[in-house]
């Protein structure tokens, strides 16, 4: 038995900040912003965090799956911005969503790829008949040091997937592979508030090498070629990197543009590529095939082949789309953004 996506859901905070405002405040050159291919980024409100956003996106996924949450046998939560350093978010979500306590809950960590690894694991549990349904969440209020280039892209969003049996799926997971190595491109040491980049490793040795290796491995193991896919979705640390991957693979931009989210909301880390996948599922038609390749620093990439079924059309209508959340926005100032994300420190 194959596994598939029975339900999917997204959530993006309403607040946005123009990345040019951040660049101007810190004296970053306009060319830096242009090179990133970004316009705005999503900012959490003062009462939003990776847990509350995960609840929102999971409720949308449950609407599309049209199942009782008590039927879910595992909840895996991928994030770089957990509310607690030591206390799982998955347990909070299990009780908040009404998932049975006779279930497995765990938080996944692999930079921006924790949720993607979770998708592979839950898919395997469904295929092995260990569970009927599993919930996978990628949710982040991404951290960045004020004035760092990373602050232009680090964003907030959440995406959730309910994985279940093939005969109930709006899209079937046909195949999946992973590619992993010890590449120090990005890290945050224990006790440090913000991550740092190993600049020489960020592009070619990390992002490009791992995504291209995972995609080529998927092709080799399954006999796929570019023309077999209608959509391609890659991890989106900025607006330019996924387009460069497409050019390296000689993929038409028409097959990439529908899955782009970072030019509009920035990079929400664990919700990046998987949010792009949700955006494609919102519009995909039966019989179309999607390749999605998330990436996580440190470093690793997964590549999935996903085949859309005729059940997709009914599910698309049952919850708000990614585009709905992208267009639902309120622009805020840097001072508001700094306040809601805790960049101001008050000492008494």
Swiss-Prot record:
GO terms for molecular function: acetyl-CoA C-acetyltransferase activity; hydroxymethylglutaryl-CoA synthase activity. It catalyses: acetoacetyl-CoA + acetyl-CoA + H2O = (3S)-3-hydroxy-3-methylglutaryl-CoA + CoA + H(+). The keyword Transmembrane does not apply. The keyword Transferase applies. Keywords: Acyltransferase, Isoprene biosynthesis, Transferase. Its EC number is 2.3.3.10. This is Hydroxymethylglutaryl-CoA synthase. GO terms for biological process: farnesyl diphosphate biosynthetic process, mevalonate pathway; isopentenyl diphosphate biosynthetic process, mevalonate pathway. The active site is at 80 (proton donor/acceptor), 112 (acyl-thioester intermediate), 235 (proton donor/acceptor). It comes from Sulfolobus acidocaldarius (strain ATCC 33909 / DSM 639 / JCM 8929 / NBRC 15157 / NCIMB 11770). Pathway: Metabolic intermediate biosynthesis; (R)-mevalonate biosynthesis; (R)-mevalonate from acetyl-CoA: step 2/3. Interacts with acetoacetyl-CoA thiolase that catalyzes the precedent step in the pathway and with a DUF35 protein. The acetoacetyl-CoA thiolase/HMG-CoA synthase complex channels the intermediate via a fused CoA-binding site, which allows for efficient coupling of the endergonic thiolase reaction with the exergonic HMGCS reaction. (3S)-3-hydroxy-3-methylglutaryl-CoA binds at residues 29, 112, 153, 202, 235, 267, 297.
């Amino acid at each position: 038995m194959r596994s598939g996506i029975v339900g999917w859901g997204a959530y993006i905070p309403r607040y946005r900040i123009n990345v040019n405002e951040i660049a101007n405040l810190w004296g970053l050159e306009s060319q830096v912003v242009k090179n990133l291919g970004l316009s705005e980024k999503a900012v959490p409100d003062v009462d939003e965090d990776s847990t509350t956003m995960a609840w929102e996106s999971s409720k949308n996924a449950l609407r599309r799956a049209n199942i009782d949450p008590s039927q879910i046998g595992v909840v895996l939560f991928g994030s770089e911005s957990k509310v607690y350093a030591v206390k799982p978010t998955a347990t909070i979500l299990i009780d908040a969503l009404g998932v049975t306590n006779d279930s497995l809950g765990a938080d996944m960590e692999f930079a921006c790829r924790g949720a993607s690894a979770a998708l592979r694991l839950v898919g395997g549990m469904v295929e092995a008949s260990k569970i009927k349904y599993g919930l996978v969440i990628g949710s982040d209020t991404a951290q960045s040091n004020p004035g760092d280039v990373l602050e232009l892209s680090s964003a907030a969003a959440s995406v959730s997937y309910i994985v279940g049996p093939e005969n109930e799926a709006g899209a079937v997971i046909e195949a999946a592979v992973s590619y992993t190595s010890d590449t120090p491109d990005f890290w945050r040491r224990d006790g440090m508030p913000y991550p740092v980049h190993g600049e020489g490793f960020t592009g070619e040795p990390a992002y490009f090498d791992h995504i291209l290796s995972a995609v080529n491995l998927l092709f080799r193991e399954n006999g796929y070629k570019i023309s077999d896919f209608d959509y391609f979705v890659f991890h989106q640390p900025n607006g330019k990197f996924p387009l460069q991957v497409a050019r390296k693979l000689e993929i038409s931009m028409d097959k990439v543009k529908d899955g782009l989210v970072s030019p509009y909301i920035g990079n929400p880390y664990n919700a990046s590529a998987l949010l792009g996948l949700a955006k494609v599922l919102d519009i995909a038609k039966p019989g179309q095939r999607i390749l999605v390749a998330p990436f996580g620093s440190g470093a690793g990439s997964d590549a999935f082949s996903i085949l859309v079924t005729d059940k997709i059309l009914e599910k698309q209508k049952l919850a708000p789309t990614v585009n709905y959340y992208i267009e639902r926005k309120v622009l805020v100032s840097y001072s508001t953004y700094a306040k809601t994300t805790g960049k101001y420190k008050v000492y008494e």
